[in-house]
């Protein structure tokens, strides 16, 4: 097959950068969005704005980080099982649905493989997907989307596609 033939003809990897060469995106986003103004953050964070520098649970800190990402990147989407109105099983996404609407924070079907496949497809179409898998045990059902699809995309497409997932 073509893929096998190409793999056997390539020089052996000698350093870590050789391994990464084919998956580094050819077109890195030139214009990184500017950070949101403090006035806007103050409005969006509401009563939590004054708590940002105080100790908090990891769940709350991740929620703050997601809020900042959603403010900075208008192409960011959060989705998974019960992440919208419910705010996720650990309330990581609490309040994000109300701030950013169903267009950017939405529930997915109860199918982890589809969630990660959807994330990969969205990333290839210019979005910054933030998928949530509720529990590690559920991730194992879907890990092939990362290991077998996303991680090998550049190689199997003859470098026509790169892996834009984070």
Explain the meaning of each model-derived region:
Residues 17-166:
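Thiamine diphosphate
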Residues 1-18:
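Active-site or pore-adjacent capping/gating segments
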């Amino acid at each position: 097959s073509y893929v096998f033939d190409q793999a056997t003809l390539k020089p052996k990897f000698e350093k870590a950068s050789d391994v990464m060469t084919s998956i580094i995106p050819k077109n890195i986003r030139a214009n990184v969005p500017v950070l949101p103004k403090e006035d806007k953050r103050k409005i969006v964070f509401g009563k939590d704005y004054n708590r940002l520098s105080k100790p908090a649970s990891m769940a709350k800190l991740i929620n703050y980080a997601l809020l900042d990402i959603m403010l900075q990147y208008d192409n960011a989407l959060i989705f998974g099982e019960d992440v919208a109105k419910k705010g996720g099983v650990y309330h990581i996404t609490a309040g994000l649905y109300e701030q950013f609407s169903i267009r950017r924070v939405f529930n997915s079907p109860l199918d982890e493989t589809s969630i990660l496949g959807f994330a990969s497809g969205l990333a290839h179409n210019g979005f910054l997907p933030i998928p949530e898998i509720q529990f590690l045990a559920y991730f194992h059902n879907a890990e092939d989307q990362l290991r077998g699809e996303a991680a090998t995309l550049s190689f199997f497409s003859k470098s026509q596609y790169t892996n834009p997932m984070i």
